[in-house]
Amino acid sequence: MNKLSSSAITTTWLAMIIIVLDQVTKYWANTSLTMGEPVAILPHLNLTLVYNYGAAFSFLSEVGGWQRWFFTALALVVGTALVIWLAKLPKRWTLEVVAINLVLSGAIGNVIDRILAGRVTDFVDFYIGSWHYATFNVADMGISIGAVLLIISEFWLKPRHEKKAHSTEESV
């Protein structure tokens, strides 16, 4: 059997679903919302169309345009590394595989925006009182949730599994 078909790379359909959801919701936001005007959805949650020309929390958003290509290149490098990582994992659903797919989908979703529009469309606005968290999108949710799951997988679950495997080897 082909090495790629027996690897977790075949799970990238999860990333594709998130990418499509991200792009559809961004299209909806761009065609249905008015820039900067919040639409109340729930207490503490608005939909507010904003454009991010930088990175997370609008980091480097006002430095002249070079950041578009810098963050595009960075996301492509990270995305390539994630695909290689998936290709080396066995074909089965683990927390690590789900996490990598979520981060990959978020990176690709935001790269599509940067390439096509030179900016990322954000529209989910969470707030408490007058404090507003950075406005975000579905791709950002994928990156954030995937990163948390990857940390849990790599630093809590894998070490436990490795300790258990090591203690089993010692008892033999």
UniProtKB/Swiss-Prot annotation:
Catalysed reaction, written as an equation: Release of signal peptides from bacterial membrane prolipoproteins. Hydrolyzes -Xaa-Yaa-Zaa-|-(S,diacylglyceryl)Cys-, in which Xaa is hydrophobic (preferably Leu), and Yaa (Ala or Ser) and Zaa (Gly or Ala) have small, neutral side chains
Keywords: Aspartyl protease, Cell inner membrane, Cell membrane, Hydrolase, Membrane, Protease, Transmembrane, Transmembrane helix
Active-site residue numbers: 122, 140
Transmembrane segments: 4-24, 39-59, 69-89, 93-113, 136-156
Residues in the signal sequence: none
Places the protein is found: Cell inner membrane
PROSITE patterns for this protein: SPASE_II
InterPro entries: Peptidase_A8
Pathway(s) served: Protein modification; lipoprotein biosynthesis (signal peptide cleavage)
Family: Belongs to the peptidase A8 family.
Protein's UniProt name: Lipoprotein signal peptidase
Taxonomic lineage of the native organism: Bacteria, Pseudomonadati, Pseudomonadota, Gammaproteobacteria, Thiotrichales
